[in-house]
Amino acid sequence: SLSSVSVSSESVIGDTKSEDTETEESEEVVRKDGNVTPGSTYATAASIGLNTTYKATTSRKSVTHWYKFTMSKAGMVQLKFAHANLSSTSNSPAWKIDFIADQFGGMVSVNSGLQDTQNQTAKIGLEAGTYYVQVTGLGVLTIGSSDYSFSVQYEDIYCETEQNDSISTADNYTKLGQTITGSISSTSDTDYYKITSAAKGYLSFQLQHDKVSSKLATDIYSVAVCDASGNTIYTMTSRTDEEKTESVNFGLAAGTYYL
């Protein structure tokens, strides 16, 4: 589930107040076609570009395909996968896609069924670097050959990174007043953001997410502010039917805090 949060800070020194309102616009996503021969191992992964659609064929002789892409700047990525409807009666898994992968699996894995003409992963925030995609044809495809297409979509936006699941690995949220985008993949997924205040002042935050119509009026997110020891200072929940939830404006001493 994709969400975004913005934190506003007002520092108070004597009678003066200053508010950080820096903003940044996302770049437009461009889509085009590309051609590449898949690699058969992690070490021989084929290089692909971002925001580019690639096509390949899975067969008995080419069951596993490896690709890699490089991000020169941190941002949000999402893998999109498509193929023709391959059955009128069964939706058995036809491909397994490991996104942000290594030899042992992926940060995100998606199964695409015979009738699933389109699949996509959650959006994931990543630092600059090189990352891998593994596409594996499952048993139902080994009797013949089948085509698929995919792309890795990139957005240049201020976002979380998917290693921020504890205080020790928290993302450093330096742009107070600017919206940061993240995603929650399960009920056990937790994202941490580090906030540093140089002076005593006030803090407030706003959480936005899409409505979840199947579970109206139940809590879907919990947002807490805690100190460096993990002690909770303030907690707010957001329901499935609320697209935007705002915290109260509360005072904090100078120091380091975590959202």
Pin down the residues of each PLM region.
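Non-catalytic, beta-strand-enriched accessory regions in extracellular/secretory proteins
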Residues: 50-76, 119-122, 132, 178-202, ...
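N-terminal compositionally biased, intrinsically disordered segments and leader/signal-like regions
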Residues: 17, 22-24, 38, 42-45, ...
